[in-house]
Amino acid sequence: MSGADKPKQFLELGGEAIICHVIDKFEATTCVDGIVVVCVESWLDYLRQLLAQKNYHKVLATIAGGATGQESIFNGLSYIERNELVAKDTVVLVHDGVRPLIDCETITACANSARNYGPTATVAPATETIVTVDGGRVVAVTERSKCRLARAPQGFNFNELYNAHMRALDEGRHDFIDSISMMSEYGYEVFVVDGPEENIKITTPRDFLTFKGFVDLKEYEQIWR
């Protein structure tokens, strides 16, 4: 099996898979009571063997994902609904298995915002100018100070998110890039919390090197405290 064949969440740094770096953060966050991990079906056995080596107490289930991110999230929500794992008004957080540089403080802030206000996205400031193009021409320039990069985790009332996904299914909508986009489309006011700038999604070799750089930096800072 080559590295190119392996899903990115299973790439390792310091002897630990990226997905485990992610779960470690949620496992350590006090307000998180349970974790459902959604995974490419053909890699479920590999994931379960990986997690069996860890002493996780909050991982409730590992289940198969779908053909799209939207379908994978719905599979996770459906599992929770079917097995009555949470009350209808419970806050649920949706996170990427390849976004390991999240921290407990941001996870908690996102959960609190979702509980107190409504659907919440973790964001980071846009550091470059955002333009809209059409036919090779710039047709709009958005004021950078008002732009944010939508990231994860994203927090929701479980019942509201589940019902929105059911509505999308009924309408044959399979094109939502994330659940925040879905909730906004269906009329919900969406709130934001600031997350760490390094909270990137690892999708390229350069992203992985950035991840390694931040991990090395944190280790260096601990040594020289």
Describe the predicted segments one by one.
Residues 29-31, 52-59:
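Short helix-capping segments at alpha-helix termini
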